Regions:
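Flexible, glycine/charged-enriched surface loops at secondary-structure junctions
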Residues: 1
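N-terminal flexible segment immediately upstream of the FAD-binding catalytic core
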Residues: 11-13
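Active-site nucleotide/adenylate-binding loops and adjacent lid/helix of ATP-dependent enzymes
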Residues: 15-142
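Short polybasic amphipathic segments
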Residues: 4-9
Length: 142
């Protein structure tokens, strides 16, 4: 429904899920999943590929990092979900500064990463098993 809360299964085998969090998700998992930078670090430590980039604290750091990793880039809030505030495929300094200025109105905790072209999949795992997967498609007009 509109609340974003779903039930998978029934009775004692059933699970309640909101976004990516189920009634079986522990607090540490929730905290990690809400922090994109921490999630990125933990994935990297486990040798799971992540986009090159880091947290930035000001526009000078932002521009230096963009120059280092190369355009196009992505900027996004460190905390959040559902793609809110994520600005993709910024191709030059002008686009980056405009996006950064806009994002600063929402948060000062900002991550910049190399833009990697490809598909965006959302995977739902319950009890260490994949129970659902979806391809996320950005809204568009035909």
């Amino acid at each position: 429904g509109k609340s974003g809360i779903y039930q998978i299964g029934y009775g004692k085998q059933g699970r309640i899920i909101e976004a990516a969090i189920s009634n079986k998700t522990n607090c540490v998992g929730v905290d990690i999943s809400c922090d994109k930078f921490l999630t990125k670090q933990l994935l990297d430590i486990q040798n799971i590929p992540v986009a090159e980039g880091r947290k930035v604290f000001n526009i000078i750091g932002l521009l230096r990092e963009a120059e280092f990793i190369g355009y196009p880039v992505v900027i996004k809030p460190q905390y959040g979900n559902k793609g809110k505030g994520v600005m993709l495929n910024l191709k030059n300094e002008k686009e980056l500064i405009k996006a950064y200025t806009s994002l600063l109105k929402i948060t000062k905790d900002i991550i910049i990463e190399k833009y990697v072209k490809g598909n965006d999949y959302r995977i739902c795992v319950v009890d260490y098993k994949v129970v659902a997967a979806s391809l996320r498609v950005v809204p568009f007009v035909i």
